[in-house]
């Protein structure tokens, strides 16, 4: 029986729109290469190969495609995919079926081997699993039946462009890293770049003891792992409103936790010689069909933790001019490395991710995603999961405190200014009064006048002092 692959009707429409131009296009099939929902794979997006820098037109045939560019783009796309997704294969749109042309098929197979060779060599960095024999190539020609094969075995695949939407769930746990990782000296330095694979292997070992638990059980003395047949739907609650419409709460009801959680280190923690300390809370969001087994979700989450940790550290190294670090370094994966931003892929509703550097914003995300994946994002499609509410609240409190301080300072300055103005005019009035008294008053009455004046001046001064005390 032929393997069954699911795609959406919108994907076929996309292929047809490319084919209608009568030109050659090549790209990547992104999705789930393995499922527990009765399918051998699910395609969730088709990302075309972008134009080369300074290039004005796309390649005219598979023979004109730069294989190195294909490999680099595949690695870049894999970095943007959460742990439940991978690069499943390639699609080719051309006036003729490339799988039926011996020469073109040979070139295509060579490109696939180069991609898989890099994936195999960097399987730990890319967090890739799966059987290479299942790598797909989809050939589409306008007016002809779509052909999809496992390129290595030449086995045809039954691909269905479904019109009925698939129900997806977004699982959003957070995984805390706070650990000293051993490093090997390379030359005279402990180089993170050269020890990255070793660090990730240690992290993989830690994740072997990680498991899913429900949020309501968090902190219990004994927490059982999920059962083999438990489904992801168990993590979501459903209620009906007054109109009878069923509403599903996507509130995260699980956590990924290790059996030996470490206490948070102090800011001045000392890292032993030959080690690097990684700390931070990694935000994970994976999209899975609603009937996916939780045992599979665990595997996807472990993969996502490794993939995002590797991506962050690699990007961190790339933006550092000098990759030589002291032995006491502590890397905060939340503040020292780029932010991870998730975005929704329409119309399926699944989520992919991207990494942005300090100073970049929504426009940077939209521009990068459009360039690499040919996805037009709406503002509501971008999900800033790595802006913790606690930090937002702290920032808000800080801003409010600063505003109040400025307000109080301004009111205090205003009070002192008013006091000085009153004193100035009181002094003038006193001088005028003294002049009038000495010129117009009889000396016999002068003592009485001065006494009344002193009493009035004292009353005014007491009122000004009282007003100053009442000012916040």
Model features per residue range: what roles?
Residues 1-88, 93-195, 199-206, 210, ...:
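N-terminal beta-strand/alpha-helix entry module and adjacent surface
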Residues 153-472:
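C-terminal functional modules of predominantly eukaryotic multidomain proteins
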């Amino acid at each position: 029986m032929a393997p069954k692959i699911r795609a959406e009707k919108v994907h076929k429409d996309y292929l047809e729109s490319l084919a209608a131009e009568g030109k050659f296009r090549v790209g990547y099939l992104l999705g789930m290469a393995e499922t527990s929902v009765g399918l051998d794979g699910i395609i969730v997006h088709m990302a075309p190969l972008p134009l080369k820098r300074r290039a004005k037109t796309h390649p005219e045939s598979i023979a004109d495609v730069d294989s190195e560019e294909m490999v680099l783009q595949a690695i870049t796309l894999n970095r943007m995919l959460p742990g439940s997704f991978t690069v499943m294969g390639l699609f080719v749109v051309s006036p003729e079926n490339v799988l039926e042309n011996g020469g073109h098929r040979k070139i295509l197979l060579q490109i696939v081997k180069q991609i898989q060779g890099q994936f195999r060599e960097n399987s730990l960095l890319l967090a890739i699993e799966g059987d290479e024999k299942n790598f797909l190539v989809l050939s589409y020609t306008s007016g002809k039946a779509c052909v999809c094969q496992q390129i290595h075995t030449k086995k045809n695949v039954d691909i269905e462009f479904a019109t009925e939407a698939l129900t997806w769930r977004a699982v959003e746990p957070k995984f805390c890293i706070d650990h000293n990782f051993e490093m090997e000296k390379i030359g005279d330095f402990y180089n993170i770049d050269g020890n990255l694979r070793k660090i990730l292997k240690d992290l993989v070992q830690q994740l072997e003891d990680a498991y899913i638990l429900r949020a309501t059980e968090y902190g219990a003395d004994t927490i059982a792992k999920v059962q083999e047949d438990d489904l992801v739907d168990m993590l979501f609650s459903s209620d009906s409103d007054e109109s009878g419409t069923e509403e599903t709460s996507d509130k995260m009801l699980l956590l990924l936790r290790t059996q030996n959680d470490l206490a948070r280190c102090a800011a001045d923690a000392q890292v032993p010689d030959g080690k690097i300390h990684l700390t931070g809370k990694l935000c994970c969001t994976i999209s899975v069909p609603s009937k996916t087994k939780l045992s599979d979700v665990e595997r996807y989450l472990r993969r996502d933790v490794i993939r995002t940790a590797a991506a962050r550290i690699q990007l961190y190294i790339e933006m550092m001019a000098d990759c030589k670090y002291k032995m006491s370094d502590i890397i905060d994966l939340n503040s020292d490395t780029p932010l991870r931003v998730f975005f929704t892929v329409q119309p399926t509703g699944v989520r992919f991710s991207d990494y942005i550097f300090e100073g970049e914003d929504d426009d940077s995300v939209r521009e990068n995603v459009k360039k690499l994946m040919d996805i037009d994002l709406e503002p509501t499609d971008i999900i800033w999961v790595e802006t913790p509410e606690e930090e937002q609240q702290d920032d808000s409190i800080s801003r409010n405190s600063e505003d109040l301080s400025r307000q109080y300072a301004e009111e205090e300055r205003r009070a002192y200014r008013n006091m000085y103005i009153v004193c100035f005019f009181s002094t003038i009035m006193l001088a005028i009064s003294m002049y009038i008294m000495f010129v117009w008053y009889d000396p016999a009455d002068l003592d009485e006048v001065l006494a009344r004046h002193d009493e009035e001046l004292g009353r005014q001064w007491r009122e000004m002092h009282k007003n100053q005390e009442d000012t916040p």
